[in-house]
Amino acid sequence: MPDHLSSLGDFTGEEIASLIARAIELKEERSRGIRHQQLAGKSVALIFEKPSTRTRVSFESAMYGLGGQVLFLSGRDTQLSRSEPLKDMARVMSRYVDGIVVRTFGQEVVNELAQYATVPVINALTDLHHPCQILSDIMTVIEKKGAIQDLKIVWVGDGNNMANSWIQAAAKLGFELILACPEGYDPDAEILAAAQAEGAKPITLLRDPQTAVLGADVINVDVFASMGQESEQDERLKIFASYQVNAEMMAKAADDAIVLHCLPAHRGEEITEDVLEGPQCVAFDEAENKMHMHKAILERFLG
């Protein structure tokens, strides 16, 4: 397994499956009251240039739940805002902590930290990839539906960082993935082409969301305007209007289809209130699973 978690493209399908299986095991053990101390005496630095609720709390809870300690640094708490070279920060932080979890804008930040750090670097989100979230999502799908290789997974909306990580996961784990995105909002072309060449099942890009969701087992949606895109909000709401996950769309999916949303949700925009609060939506189980998945990731890379 790689020394860092930069993107899912760096892993084999077996390595991804092993991480998810371990997360499910850790969740089950916690439900039985088993407490873990695998990372006692170790510390991790959370460097978050982008603010977060779920990602921060789930990583902190995961580290504490394994007996470790957490140091949280916002963008204001580091010298990055004053243009400190990343290679300097990486080497200094490596002498203070046992791992670095980064939530930032450019993927190049994670890549350079990983190049110079002597401790594991974990990508908690960039504009290009969101690997930890997709691992948590897949864990949720497996819990609810069984083997993911037998399922039709559909991504509806912006071809953003989550879409890119879903594409890489589909290639590695061998499941069918359909992405429905408006023209001009496609996932990364290089990531898509590489995954289509590698994957055992089709990875397809469509424009029409109603066609994409026909018979879908899993529908995955995210906000139409991500953090940093606030100035595009009004335009995006118009462009993505037909990509809203609502009762009409759900009627075209399989009867037992589930809906994923990483949260926070903008009710009435990318998803309607009735779907988000309905029995087919598993967003809150998905949110819980971030903590268990992060435990498995921290245990693997820092243990």
Curated annotation (Swiss-Prot):
InterPro entries: Asp/Orn_carbamoyltranf_P-bd, Asp/Orn_carbamoylTrfase, Asp/Orn_carbamoylTrfase_sf, Asp_carbamoyltransf_Asp/Orn-bd, Orn/put_carbamltrans, OTCase_ArgI. GO terms for biological process: arginine biosynthetic process via ornithine; citrulline biosynthetic process; L-arginine biosynthetic process. GO terms for molecular function: amino acid binding; ornithine carbamoyltransferase activity. This is Ornithine carbamoyltransferase. GO terms for cellular component: cytoplasm. It comes from the Bacteria. Disulfide bonds: none annotated. It holds the Pfam family OTCace_N.
